[in-house]
Amino acid sequence: MQLGAFSVSLSVKDLAASRAFYEALGFSVTGGDPAQNWLVLRSNGTVIGLFQGMFEGNLLTFNPGWDQYRQELGQFQDVRELQDALDAQGIALTTRTDPDGQGTGYLQLADPDGNVILIDQHVERPKAR
């Protein structure tokens, strides 16, 4: 499976305090909107998202269609293909994407220890190969 770019999405209580903490560790803001309570920070190839009041717990996040620097890939495994592959393996999904969609989409699942995994596609389905 080609899951795409990886990041850790952290649920934070105080966006400004978390931003200052991660900047002290060498991360820089590369995206997001503080007015909407979220930021994306990067340190070399490591990406974290800070989200205040958007979800409970932390998420492992994959973005099909992007490389680690948010550059759109020409060919990639679409979120709907990933959903079909996970279904075929008998892996339970907690949130499903529209199987007939063409654009963006997301799905969620949890590993055996309850860690939530978000597969969140922000780009259009790739053209047929």
Predicted regions and their residues:
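Conserved acetyl-CoA-binding loop of GNAT-fold acetyltransferases
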Residues: E23-T30, I91
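N-terminal beta-strand motif that seeds the catalytic metal site of vicinal oxygen chelate
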Residues: M1-A20, H122-R129
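Loop/turn position at the start of each blade in beta-propeller repeats
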Residues: L3, Q36, Q102-T104
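Conserved short beta-strand elements that form part of the metal-binding/catalytic scaffold
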Residues: S28-R70, V116-Q121
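Vicinal oxygen chelate
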Residues: K13-A16, M54-F55, F62-V116, V123
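Structural preference for long, well-ordered alpha-helical segments within the folded cores
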Residues: A20-A24, D113
